Amino acid sequence: MAAALQVLRHLARAPSGPLLWGGPLARMASSMALAEQARQLFESTVGAVLPGPLLQRALSLDPDSGELKVRDRSFQLRQNLYLVGFGKAVLGMAAAAEELLGQHLVQGVISVPKGIRAAMEHAGKQEMLLKPHSRIQVFEGAEDNLPDRDALRAALAIRQLAEGLTADDLLLVLISGGGSALLPAPIPPVTLEEKQTLTKLLAARGATIQELNTIRKALSQLKGGGLAQAAYPAQVVSLILSDVVGDPVEVIASGPTVASIHSVQDCLYILNRYGLRTALPRSVKTVLARADSDPHGPHTCGHVLNVILGSNALALAEAQKQAEALGYRAVVLSTAIQGDVKSVAQFYGLLARVAGAHLALPGAGASVQEDERLYELAADLQLPDLQLKEALEAVVGAPGPVCLLAGGEPTVRLQGSGKGGRNQELALRVGVELGQWPLGTVDVLFLSGGTDGQDGPTEAAGAWVRPELTSQAAAEGLDVATFLAHNDSHTFFCRFQGGAHLLHTGLTGTNVTDAHFLFLHPQ
């Protein structure tokens, strides 16, 4: 067994040669080798956006003069540096900042996911942990990525620190994905429970992250520029690890250091769109009604410097580099994959069919109808940075295997009470799509994973699939359609082939949305 694994690892490191020699055993070896490559590539992708190296590149401190440089801006430190943070990656960001800034840091407060310190310690990731006698106070909360009382206490502690600052002080704000849930501070009389219920209803009806954040900001003391306002007149530097498509700073963690550009009318439009305006609690109506006469958040944030440290684009650039080193012709399709997960899955499924046809039949390719349908699906998704033409041209000109890379956050409309996440649901739906298309002599594998290591309320980061998924599942007595109808993708993957198709990384300490890999290897 050990010898067989060594052979497979060798194959995973040498994809430029043929992986298939014919026969079921060879095909199984190819499948395992591709899966190993996919896992390695995902690890490299995540490694490119870990908080420590990112902070070290963004910050530099002159130990003699106490001058802190943030990109091209300079700040003088003289026992006037404070720190707050919130998000899934903030523990590691704070540890890196503490290591760099040392005794210059006076005080800090961070809000991080429940159990993350124990998880990092258990995983041996000491670089993600604060020093034993740290000046940074840590609050853990937002279990299952939902705002709760513990996160509320953290938010109030952050607000208290910010409100105590003066014009001589500098506030370093660390922000990453998951920050919205970890910084809940509703505007009275709205309660945490009321705000949470409204957010859940919107999410269940398919609201986008941008729409959710618009509502959150309107009902929050700290989001939508509220934290920047609380810290005024202190200087504020926000270091942001983006988990939002396109990296809009006003959307990431609901923009606590960016003045909100949305009006009450924007909120009412969203609530109308999802049929919730007439069902609003009285407290929410009260806050929205007075917002026009008493605008929340500062009109400007001239005292704030917002810096994007890392993003999905940075992660995929590393994935492309690593895939090419493995012998693939690699193309980044898009860093802005959005839309309904069903539509995204259909696009990936047909993309595999069309690209696979070009690889299997050079000079012939897919039918005109299939090509046209692929471009129609792409147009429906409205992806601003989609490189579909470039990807297909690369496939046509490729002498060997191809890896198509993408990132973003598809939306899952909840219809059942199953357990899953958008990455596992996307992978399962793509598996179904792959099984519907004849892929000929091309070996195909699709992987979808969350860079934070947690896909929904599960312990998996995502999953990978192959065209044989539906038939193999049926042989095990598993009906894929039933699991999808109940949004129960995690349960499916746990049962299917003993969970072998699940992607397990543990909490990574970073978060730059999701990564999607489509591997196409000619036999």
Curated annotation (Swiss-Prot):
The gene is GLYCTK. It is found in: Cytoplasm. Its EC number is 2.7.1.31. This is Glycerate kinase. Pfam families: DUF4147 (PF13660), MOFRL (PF05161). It is an enzyme of class 2 (transferase). Transmembrane segments: none annotated. It comes from the Eukaryota. It comes from Bos taurus (Bovine). GO terms for molecular function: ATP binding; glycerate kinase activity.
